[in-house]
Amino acid sequence: MTELKQLILIGPLLAFAHAASAQDAFKSEQVKSGSEIYARHCAACHGPRMADPEGAPDLRKFPRDQRERFLTSVSKGKNSMPPWGDLLKPDEIEALWAYVTTGGN
């Protein structure tokens, strides 16, 4: 089998495995907490369950390898996004990261 065929066949499996491992890396309570925080503070701009954001980045597409960038953006704000560091505790921002990383599941 050529490398291209192998990649076509194996690629979706690897993507699924990556998503599953990201979800396993976070405790379900942390993801649930992140979901609640997201609904309260983020959904108005980023859309319910991160879908159809109005003028804000689509967080479903946020690079999963840029955790520090996410934490800093939420804490200190960026562009038109206000800073949330005074309102949210670090563990709450981490819970948001868990929620975003698991794709809202």
Where would I find each of the regions flagged by the language model?
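Residues immediately within or flanking Cys/His clusters that coordinate Zn2+
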Residues: A39
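Post-cleavage N-terminal segment of exported redox proteins
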Residues: M1-Q30, S73, L87, Y99-N105
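Short cysteine clusters
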Residues: C42-C45
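Generic anion/oxyanion-binding catalytic loop in active/binding sites
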Residues: G11, Q23, G34, L59, ...
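Axial heme c-ligation environment in periplasmic c-type cytochrome domains
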Residues: P53-R60, S75-N105
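Gly/Gly-Pro-rich "capping" loops immediately C-terminal to redox-active cysteine motifs
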Residues: S28-E36, G47-K78
